[in-house]
């Protein structure tokens, strides 16, 4: 069922030709270049497969999903069509009671998303007696284990991520497995520097009150920067830019060494721990984009990045591409309109809820090369549909051999 819903013969054909295929000739020629790695990762494929299997195994039961299975509107809509109901948190609400589980009973089935759920929400769900189907990604579980170990050993988890992202919320909650477990979430290097400046007591550093206020929603309850920043273990949301995660870890380690290095018997391991917890799929997709941009052919004339606007890994792919070429981040193939010659997209590097922008005449005249990649939550059929619409805009077709389907 998953294969039938999300397969694309067109994508398979281009892959078989070395990820590059030229359609048309002369001034109308369009060279499509696919990144070496893109689209559904193992964790997403597994989560979606579990959801389909759950519907099959429990055809007559009410099935609920905590949040979204993954950050892709097409896949989530398919879940709704299968009769799976979505449980969303109260708008703008954080804490253990943000989801309303009061309507769940032991006769229901609840699917936990690939991002996982917080420790507190998991305990509340168990109390309902409902059957729980856990699709949490294995790469996420690795990070959870690190944060749990940090809390056990008395280290504050400094998490590089988006504090409001489901995965980061679930990861941070692992610190609460131990009474004195602490965490603080930083979005980027600039926010990490706020922490480092405080550690070192640099001129212009935030006051204690300002620090607590700034990180109010991004740190564990009762977080005390004077007490909780002497021993730090770095972790990250698995879909962040790997280069930035590694850079933050390196700088935090240096900051702690500057702060405590003059103490007798100083041992950096007593103050700092770090492990690379970027998932392999995220790394592969980021590396594939970098390789495309640095290839002998050079960057494509235009890059189209396909994936949900609230997908962290997709947003990072768009930012990477935009450093080298014109880049459009679209949520779905339908954002490309051949008739009007327009494309709707989210400006790169903006918050996930930023309104779409429309570009007219976005495909230049003459032969062009168009690169495509997609986030780990984007199925191949949406990539194939985007290619078809791009070709249609140039008056071309995919020219697939007879009998080879193009899933749209």
Question: What are the roles of these predicted feature ranges?
Answer:
Residues 1-408:
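The feature marks the mature, well-folded catalytic cores of soluble enzymes
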